[in-house]
A protein has these predicted regions:
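Conserved glycine-rich cofactor-binding loop
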Residues: 12, 19-21
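Conserved glycine-rich Rossmann-like NAD(P)H-binding loop of the short-chain dehydrogenase/reductase
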Residues: 35-49
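Substrate-binding pocket helix/loop in short-chain dehydrogenase/reductase
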Residues: 98-99, 103-111
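Active-site loop immediately N-terminal to the catalytic Tyr-X3-Lys motif
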Residues: 100, 152-158, 180-181
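Active-site helix of classical SDR
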Residues: 122, 163, 171
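Alpha-helical segment proximal to the catalytic Tyr-Lys
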Residues: 127, 176-180
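Residue(s) in the substrate-gating loop at a strand-loop-helix junction
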Residues: 147
Length: 186
């Protein structure tokens, strides 16, 4: 419904966190615009549900169950693709805890999911995008899903704030580095 006026036919998008929420909505909207999809989620039931909807829209859809913090697993998925034009880097998580009560294991997990995995996926996809012979002509897009928490502080969200502020900086740096390849980063 949302992207029907856009023509993304013959484009290929990778969407992480595609099983629920924003990732699911983005994957379906891209498919409605004619985009072929590679969707990634941690849970089989969620990814199967989204895949079923996308396939009804008569676009190609490959689905993978994957924990994005597993570098080798996500790298393998990305390397299997012949082409990626769009990345919706959406996978993420939050464990609300008061700053003074943040458990180290929770902080490390959130940094791994929200920052390190996001960086790794963006880097792997950017490298794949840059290899396309006519990339400068056809362009590419990387969308790093942030949050208002990347701009303001919030209660019981210190670690999430930290991750999203870092993501904002990463996105700006990537935009500068990838502009000469006509890869837009937002």
């Amino acid at each position: 419904m949302y992207l029907k006026k856009y023509n993304l036919k013959n484009k290929y998008a990778l969407v992480t966190g595609a099983g629920k929420g924003l990732g699911r909505a983005c994957a379906i909207a891209l498919a409605e615009a004619g985009c072929n999809l590679v969707i990634v989620s941690r849970t089989k039931r969620d990814i199967d549900s989204v895949s079923k909807i996308i396939k009804k829209l008569k676009v190609k859809c490959k689905s993978y169950i994957c924990d994005v913090t597993n570098y080798n697993e996500i790298k393998s998925i990305i390397n299997k693709q012949s082409r990626i034009d769009i990345l919706v880097n959406n996978a993420g998580n939050n464990i609300p805890e008061h700053f003074t009560k943040v458990k180290t294991k929770n902080m490390e997990y959130l940094v791994k999911v929200n920052t390190i995995a996001t960086f790794n996926i963006a880097q792997l996809c950017a490298i794949k995008m840059m290899k396309l012979k006519n990339r400068k002509k056809v362009g590419g897009s990387i969308i790093n899903m942030s949050s208002q928490m990347g701009h303001v502080g919030g209660p019981i969200r210190s670690v999430y704030n930290m991750n999203k502020w870092g993501l904002e900086g990463l996105t700006k740096g990537m935009a500068v580095d990838l502009a000469k390849y006509n890869i837009r980063v937002n």
